[in-house]
């Protein structure tokens, strides 16, 4: 550390504490991190250096003296009988070697480690009494967490009852897999909601929901890795993990008992290379002394256990050059900048574009054409510019000028109150019309097969459609004007458009593209009020009275339906013969242990109690996806009499088989 005076150290430490407190609060309490982990870690390490050199500047409230963030939420507070401490971090193999030497010196001999993957999620404690799950809680500040028991009951791999009547506490990590994360963000995009930046944020936001039904839909998972105060006959970490597996807990099977640094470094190298191919996010490797008696003798500091350490992966970054900044117009008029760059390989994929989100973000980063930038993937998934390499900025560089006019229609762009986004508010903007019609025809909405973005673009270019109602006035002669459209393509598209008239009204509401109103909100509203005429007559309070709808959606819907243009278009749709009624089933009674929620199910054989169509609808109402073929992704096969090849294939693949009666018994 460079020479620094006591006064300078005090001043710098104070600034660092304030900044770190702000970042920690955003990360732990709001699930909305403001900086990447490596930036936080660098600042935290600097504060530790200062406090080590000048012990007199350490304050009791310094973030180095506590765990996590302060608790500020609507959840019941839970005091941890044994603190849930965080881990010390190292960022190089040399530091890991120093840790090993320190352990050997403290213990007096070489030690064996249980080496595990560091899962990128949030810490979770599970407490059982007489084998029954009684409480689940988050880490919080390490001493006081939040009671999330109601939500934890909807995480599929958390056992609600143990095979033995034990009173125990186990701890682990709650996470969201990459596939579930991608699915959730796709759903949120379709519903006009902001997407999560990474799986860790998504997991934290999903577990800390006031409505457990939201958690239930989010497909969270756990890895359990700690047994708090295990029985005396369990003397090591790996024995504890094996026993927890036997009790039904989901543990990570990649962990290994290793004795030498060479083996540990090989493990690190292996998973540094494999991390992109894993189904879940990891941000490092954890070393724990395997012998529990040694762990107990070493104990903890005020903040971290002495006997374990986390090796953090360095962020994978690539440098590339910004060649252009393009602006795209979404269906709601939001205009978004995207950096177009020289292609680079990053975390297993080729990346040539990264969102710049909004004008404030672009200006804050000060990204310019010709800049060399550092690119990484937030949460190993979303390409993001981390910084501009100023030393490589061209000498003739000039600040980027935010456009004043819409790139599609030339209309003046505006900032609406309380929004950082730029918007085009021209309802006839070709880009918005194109996006709106494409959305209307998409699978979550009216599901008009064959009507994709390229066809929509041609329809607009040929002046055949100006809004979604015009789709229902198209003729074979109109479609014959499109490129590569022959008789078969024309007939198929006209049939698909005609079939969409029969859709239940919630699909029409989804397709209208009303701000903040996605498929879920549309279904809830249609279930409640049954037809579009009734819905259009409602006030804000009527709509907001529906559980999970809220004022934002209610105000957006009433504003939309108050527009004369919207009323005219809906009247045109009704005149064209579109169904305006809710045709679905009422929301079924919630079944706490519903085994078919978010599962893929196949029906085979002759059923006795239901027709195939009736049972399919029943399963879909319970949240199942019913498909016609058996694959490795199938979760259950329900069979009746004379079951054939599907039954045999399920047996070969080891997929659970249920008789019709067994399936019915589980959903009564």
From Swiss-Prot:
<dbReference type="InterPro" id="IPR010994">
    <property type="entry name" value="RuvA_2-like"/>
</dbReference>
<feature type="active site" description="N6-AMP-lysine intermediate">
    <location>
        <position position="118"/>
    </location>
</feature>
<feature type="binding site">
    <location>
        <position position="409"/>
    </location>
    <ligand>
        <name>Zn(2+)</name>
    </ligand>
</feature>
<dbReference type="InterPro" id="IPR033136">
    <property type="entry name" value="DNA_ligase_CS"/>
</dbReference>
<feature type="binding site">
    <location>
        <position position="116"/>
    </location>
    <ligand>
        <name>NAD(+)</name>
    </ligand>
</feature>
<keyword id="KW-0520">NAD</keyword>
<keyword id="KW-0234">DNA repair</keyword>
<keyword id="KW-0460">Magnesium</keyword>
<dbReference type="InterPro" id="IPR013840">
    <property type="entry name" value="DNAligase_N"/>
</dbReference>
<dbReference type="GO" id="GO:0003911">
    <property type="term" value="F:DNA ligase (NAD+) activity"/>
</dbReference>
<feature type="binding site">
    <location>
        <position position="406"/>
    </location>
    <ligand>
        <name>Zn(2+)</name>
    </ligand>
</feature>
<dbReference type="InterPro" id="IPR001679">
    <property type="entry name" value="DNA_ligase"/>
</dbReference>
<keyword id="KW-0479">Metal-binding</keyword>
<dbReference type="InterPro" id="IPR004150">
    <property type="entry name" value="NAD_DNA_ligase_OB"/>
</dbReference>
<feature type="binding site">
    <location>
        <position position="429"/>
    </location>
    <ligand>
        <name>Zn(2+)</name>
    </ligand>
</feature>
<feature type="binding site">
    <location>
        <position position="312"/>
    </location>
    <ligand>
        <name>NAD(+)</name>
    </ligand>
</feature>
<dbReference type="Pfam" id="PF03119">
    <property type="entry name" value="DNA_ligase_ZBD"/>
</dbReference>
<dbReference type="InterPro" id="IPR001357">
    <property type="entry name" value="BRCT_dom"/>
</dbReference>
<feature type="binding site">
    <location>
        <position position="139"/>
    </location>
    <ligand>
        <name>NAD(+)</name>
    </ligand>
</feature>
<feature type="binding site">
    <location>
        <position position="424"/>
    </location>
    <ligand>
        <name>Zn(2+)</name>
    </ligand>
</feature>
<dbReference type="Pfam" id="PF00533">
    <property type="entry name" value="BRCT"/>
</dbReference>
<protein>
    <recommendedName>
        <fullName>DNA ligase</fullName>
        <ecNumber>6.5.1.2</ecNumber>
    </recommendedName>
</protein>
<dbReference type="InterPro" id="IPR013839">
    <property type="entry name" value="DNAligase_adenylation"/>
</dbReference>
<feature type="binding site">
    <location>
        <position position="288"/>
    </location>
    <ligand>
        <name>NAD(+)</name>
    </ligand>
</feature>
<dbReference type="GO" id="GO:0005829">
    <property type="term" value="C:cytosol"/>
</dbReference>
<dbReference type="Pfam" id="PF12826">
    <property type="entry name" value="HHH_2"/>
</dbReference>
<keyword id="KW-0235">DNA replication</keyword>
<dbReference type="Pfam" id="PF14520">
    <property type="entry name" value="HHH_5"/>
</dbReference>
<keyword id="KW-0436">Ligase</keyword>
<dbReference type="InterPro" id="IPR041663">
    <property type="entry name" value="DisA/LigA_HHH"/>
</dbReference>
<dbReference type="GO" id="GO:0006260">
    <property type="term" value="P:DNA replication"/>
</dbReference>
<feature type="binding site">
    <location>
        <begin position="86"/>
        <end position="87"/>
    </location>
    <ligand>
        <name>NAD(+)</name>
    </ligand>
</feature>
<keyword id="KW-0227">DNA damage</keyword>
<feature type="binding site">
    <location>
        <position position="173"/>
    </location>
    <ligand>
        <name>NAD(+)</name>
    </ligand>
</feature>
<keyword id="KW-0464">Manganese</keyword>
<dbReference type="Pfam" id="PF01653">
    <property type="entry name" value="DNA_ligase_aden"/>
</dbReference>
<keyword id="KW-0862">Zinc</keyword>
<dbReference type="GO" id="GO:0046872">
    <property type="term" value="F:metal ion binding"/>
</dbReference>
<dbReference type="InterPro" id="IPR012340">
    <property type="entry name" value="NA-bd_OB-fold"/>
</dbReference>
<feature type="domain" description="BRCT">
    <location>
        <begin position="591"/>
        <end position="668"/>
    </location>
</feature>
<comment type="function">
    <text>DNA ligase that catalyzes the formation of phosphodiester linkages between 5'-phosphoryl and 3'-hydroxyl groups in double-stranded DNA using NAD as a coenzyme and as the energy source for the reaction. It is essential for DNA replication and repair of damaged DNA.</text>
</comment>
<comment type="similarity">
    <text>Belongs to the NAD-dependent DNA ligase family. LigA subfamily.</text>
</comment>
């Amino acid at each position: 550390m460079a020479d620094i005076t006591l006064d300078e150290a005090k001043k710098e430490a104070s600034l660092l504490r304030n900044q770190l407190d702000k970042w920690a609060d955003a990360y732990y309490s709001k699930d909305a991190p403001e900086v990447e982990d490596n930036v936080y870690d660098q600042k935290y390490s600097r504060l530790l250096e200062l406090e080590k050199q000048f012990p007199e500047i350490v304050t009791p409230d310094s973030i180095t003296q506590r765990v996590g963030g302060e608790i500020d939420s609507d959840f019941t507070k839970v005091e941890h009988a044994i603190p849930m401490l965080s881990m010390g971090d190292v960022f190089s193999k040399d530091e890991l070697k120093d840790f090993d030497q320190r352990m050997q010196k403290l213990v007096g001999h070489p030690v064996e480690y249980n080496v595990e993957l560091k899962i990128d999620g949030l810490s979770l404690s599970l407490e059982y009494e007489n084998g029954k799950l009684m409480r689940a809680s988050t880490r919080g500040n390490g001493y006081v967490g939040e009671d999330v028991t109601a939500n934890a009951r909807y995480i599929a791999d958390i056992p609600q009852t143990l095979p033995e009547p034990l009173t125990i506490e186990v701890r682990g990590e709650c996470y969201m897999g990459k596939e579930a994360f991608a699915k959730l963000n796709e759903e949120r995009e379709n519903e006009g909601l902001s997407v999560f930046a990474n799986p860790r944020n998504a997991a934290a936001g999903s577990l800390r929901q006031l409505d457990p039904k939201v958690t239930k839909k989010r497909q969270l998972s756990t890895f359990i890795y700690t047994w708090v105060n295990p029985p005396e006959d369990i003397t090591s970490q790996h024995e504890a993990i094996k026993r927890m597996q036997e009790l039904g807990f989901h543990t990570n099977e990649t962990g290994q008992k290793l004795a030498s640094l060479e083996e540990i470094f090989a493990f690190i190298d292996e998973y540094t290379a494999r991390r992109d191919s894993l189904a879940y996010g990891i941000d490092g490797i954890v070393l724990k002394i395997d012998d529990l008696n040694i762990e107990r003798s070493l104990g903890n500091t005020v903040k971290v256990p002495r006997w374990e350490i986390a090796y953090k992966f360095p962020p994978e970054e690539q440098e590339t050059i910004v060649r252009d900044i393009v602006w795209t117009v979404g269906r709601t008029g939001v205009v978004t900048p995207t950096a177009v760059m020289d292609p680079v390989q990053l975390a297993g994929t080729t990346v040539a574009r990264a969102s710049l989100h909004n004008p404030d973000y672009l200006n804050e980063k000060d990204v310019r054409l010709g800049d060399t930038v550092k690119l990484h993937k937030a949460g190993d998934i979303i390409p993001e510019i981390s910084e501009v390499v100023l030393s490589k900025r061209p000498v003739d560089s000039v600040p980027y000028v935010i456009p004043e006019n819409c790139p599609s229609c030339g209309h003046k762009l505006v900032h609406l109150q309380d929004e950082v986004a730029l918007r085009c508010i021209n309802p006839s903007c070709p880009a918005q019309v194109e996006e709106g019609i494409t959305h209307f025809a998409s699978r979550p909405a009216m599901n008009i097969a064959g009507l994709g973005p390229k066809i929509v673009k041609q329809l607009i270019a040929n002046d055949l459609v100006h809004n979604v109602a015009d789709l229902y006035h198209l003729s074979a002669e109109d479609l014959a004007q499109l490129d590569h459209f022959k008789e078969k393509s024309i007939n198929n598209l006209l049939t698909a458009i005609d079939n969409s008239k029969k859709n239940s009204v919630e699909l029409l509401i989804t397709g209208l593209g009303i701000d903040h109103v996605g498929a879920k909100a549309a279904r809830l509203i249609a279930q409640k009020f049954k037809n579009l005429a009734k819905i259009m007559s409602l006030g804000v309070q009527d709509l907001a009275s529906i559980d999970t709808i809220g004022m934002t959606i209610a105000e957006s819907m009433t504003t939309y339906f108050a527009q004369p243009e919207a009323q005219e278009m809906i009247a045109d749709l009704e005149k064209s013969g579109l169904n305006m009624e809710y045709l679905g089933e009422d929301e079924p009674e919630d079944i706490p242990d519903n085994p078919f929620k978010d599962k893929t199910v196949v029906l085979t054989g002759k059923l006795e109690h239901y027709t195939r169509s009736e049972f399919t609808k029943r399963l879909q109402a319970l949240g199942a996806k019913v498909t016609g073929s058996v694959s490795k992704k199938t979760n259950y096969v329900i069979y009746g009499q004379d079951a054939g090849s599907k039954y045999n294939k399920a047996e070969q693949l080891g997929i659970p088989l249920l008789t019709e009666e067994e399936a019915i018994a589980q959903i009564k």
